[in-house]
Design a protein with these regions (language model features):
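Conserved C-terminal structural/oligomerization subdomain of aldehyde/semialdehyde dehydrogenase
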Residues: 25-148
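Alpha-helical packing segments of well-folded alpha/beta enzyme cores
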Residues: 1-2
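General beta-strand structural signal in soluble alpha/beta enzymes
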Residues: 12-15, 105-107
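Short, solvent-exposed loop/turn elements at beta->coil junctions and helix N-caps
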Residues: 16-25
Length: 148
């Protein structure tokens, strides 16, 4: 995604390579991508809208909350998001407008395992966690037996 971000007109602001190897030279022991920040991309670019499972973030300036919500919801994915605000109530109100399965306000990856987790739109396959797991990981079977 570092290369794609650049191809789409973005600029690597921080990171973008593995610690000891160029991105194309992945050793057999694996490679670890530095935390990467990409700026200057369109909010509709592939790098900005795909679900990247790695330490990559794209930055997008906005004029008001409505524009920020529009940019956040433009993706076809919706696993998780985070909102950072000096005003927790405002952050909570903003979070309600996001199309994601879980939203953290002024925190990240903080979840009670008894609560549901899972994405919306093209993210995930439903809810897991707590009672939701019983339905998600169970398959009901109706067995009818006629006695002797």
């Amino acid at each position: 995604y570092s290369r794609l971000g650049q191809e789409e007109g973005g600029q690597i602001l921080v990171g973008g390579t593995s610690e000891d190897h160029p991105v194309d030279d992945v050793p057999s022991a694996g490679a670890f991508l530095q935390p990467t920040v990409i700026g200057g991309l369109s909010p509709t670019s592939k790098t900005a809208t795909e679900e990247i499972f790695g330490p990559v973030v794209t930055l997008h300036p906005f004029n008001d909350e409505d524009e920020a919500v529009e940019m956040a919801n433009i993706t076809e994915y919706g696993l998780a998001g985070s909102v950072w605000s000096k005003d927790p109530e405002r952050g909570h109100a903003f979070a309600k407008r996001l199309d994601t399965g879980i939203v953290w306000v002024n925190t990240w990856l903080n979840r009670d395992l008894r609560t549901p987790f899972g994405g919306v739109k093209q993210s995930g396959v439903g809810r897991e966690g707590g009672a939701w797991s019983l339905n998600f990981f169970s398959e009901l079977t109706n067995i009818c037996v006629k006695g002797p």
